[in-house]
Amino acid sequence: PASLGQLSVAPVVAFGFTDPEPPAPITVQGSMLQVPEGHALSLVGGDITVQAHMFEDGTMQAANLLAPGGQINLLSVASPGEVLVPSSQTGPNINGASFTTLGMVTLKDGAMLDVSGQLGADAEGNPIGGNGGTVLVRAGQLVVDASFIQGNTVGAVDGERAAVDIQVSQKATLTNGSSINTITSGAGKGGDVQLTADTVTMENGASIVTATTDGDGVGGDVVLNVGTLSLMGGSSIQSQSQTFTPEGLGQGGNVIIQGLEGAGSAAKSVDLSGDSFLLSSSFGTGEGGRLAITSKSLTLDGAATTVNAEAADVGGGGDIAVNVQHASLSGGATIKTSTGSADPNAPVAATVTVQGLLGVGSMADSVALSGSGSGIVSDTQGTARSGDVAVHAKTVILTEGAVIQTGSSFNTGPGGNVTIVADSVDISGEARILSLSAIGDAGQVAITADALTMNNVSIESSTSSSGRGGNVELNVGTVSLSNGAKINSSTSETGRAGDITMNVGTLSLANGSEISSASIGTEAITNPDDGTIRAPGTAGNVVITAAGRFTSDASTIATSAEANHGGDISITAHSVQLSNGTLITANSNAPLEVKETVLIDGQLVEQVVGDGNAGNISVRSGSTYVMTNSSMTTEASRASGGQIAIITPEMVRVINGRVSTSVAGSANDTAGGNITIDPQFVVLQGAQIVAKAFAGTGGAIDIIATSAFIRDPASIVDASSTLGISGTINIQSPLQNIGGELAPLSDEFSSAAALLAQQCAARAAGGKFSTFVVAAREGLPAEPGGFLASPSLTAELLGSHHSGRDSYRPIAAVTGAFPEYEARPIQLAKLGSACHHQ
């Protein structure tokens, strides 16, 4: 009837709460609330709980809130204020009364918030994509317990920019398998997940996932603005690209963790443990997304705990950028990029960069890796090149088997580069820095630091194939290797080992440490398909330049080749000291001619590709060269020896040591290498300076000692040949063969008792005492070549007018003209009563 009233419904403009008491709670229990596609569903009040309903038979029915392609708004408040619609922002904060306190939102028992798009059809029956909507949560606390939030996109339309938008003023907790998902399965872009909270805790398998599947769509980003973030018990944050069709180029979204203020700010701490992980992955043709962490502290602990960017097919993995003050990885935890593609056109694996909070080029305070399996790694299991690893920190510590590594001994592609820039690098306990390749070239290892300490560890760049070993380059102030520490570049087949270049302040090797660039292959490689034969690889070079001292105790520097040319060794330092079995060697066990067989116009043709001569050794010292119980050799078993040159302005001293360029080959055209020694003094004690040959010609030994050449009878200088022509020995020195032998000064000292007795005897004889007289020199300067007076003298003035006071009075430094004073004796010793008992 016309007289009846009508109910009119208009869009809500705002939700207002004016009562000083907290708003009443809202509970959805086992119900399903759904709005039409594209519309909004809002719950605004006090604490909000979405949970299951338990029936009398004990079964549970989960609660569901559904808004396909629309919006779900959950706003929990605990104080007066106003919420505006549709923005869900708070109203003007008049007199500070707008929502000073927020409430709690709880999702549990399998609850679902879903704003996923629905695939439809147009008038002609063609499929139409459905864009995902937005889940918006505003609260003081959020608990998601065994429940789910999702906003998926299908088809060619884009999802909302933020599929999940959560802002919590205090703490957000996801637990017991809970998940937040946004997935795009067409050409449309997936929505982002944005979570802002002072504390975020994910535990017991909780996850946040964005993904793209079967299309060209770009996955949504995961952006966490947090104070602290903790992942425990297998929890994860993931961005995935799962595009498998050849035309599918869908790219995974990025994972970004930063401070509460957003871009450019740093979280207080990010902690992952118990097999939890951050993952950016590509499982098809699409590219993986980027992983970026900006936090004052990053802690990873546990064997399967990882920050990982991986590519399993031709798609490339995303890069990892970690900006921190302090980073700690332990118990097998890793920061890792990898690719497993067998496609030769697959892109380079992603890079890993750990640096300071200011980004590119800045330095973290500390990066510490400990425990077997812990590490920063870029790896490939296929043909693609491994990515690079860069660490910039004031202090870098690796211990207990931890690694910084690119490539592996299984990959067929080239290894990546390792770059470390630090104030100090401390490596101990079998830790390693590696660039490896099974078939391709190994990458470069470069360290720039004020100090590098290595204790029972290794730095290695090597390949086990026809590839080239990578170079190792150190630019370090102080370098110390001890207890078997190794710096190595090697090849074990036909490739050339890389070079090792060290520009340092001081270098110390001790207790079996080693610097080596070597070819360890022993035989030529035969190709069974065409019968061609490849020659074994050659050793690389070692170049050491030290502004200060170089010392080596019971250690090795080697550029040896088992079946090809040995590499060269060059050492330049202020002083050089070798002791206790130190070996510097550039030996070769190869034949005089290194040959291989190649296929030319269908014919196998043998050709010479090199010689098997030993490498050369050059040592230049700015002061002295001292070798004790050590060896320096460029010997060859079947070819010619290398050259050895020792150049220093002061002294070369060899004690029970060996300098040898001898050869043992049976060919008459093998020759011992030449030896050149050119200091001011040469001192040989039980030493061997030899350039001998068996069938060929002995080498030339040139010793130029501008002041003296001194050797004992046990020392040998020999350039003879057993069957061939002896070499030459040329010794130029104004002074040679002093005394026939060298002997140390006596270490027997006069008896103080005997000297005291003589003093007593002198006193008894006539009362005369030994005296020391200080007399002026009338201001004359010291004569040329004479001794200079001590700048400060003291004496006990006994028996003089100074006795009894100022017992130890310093005499002024001797400078300029002496003052005039009367020369008087100073009694040097007070015998006292000692003489009365003689």
Please tell me what each predicted stretch does.
Residues P1-Q838:
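Extracellular and secretory-pathway beta-repeat/beta-biased strand scaffolds
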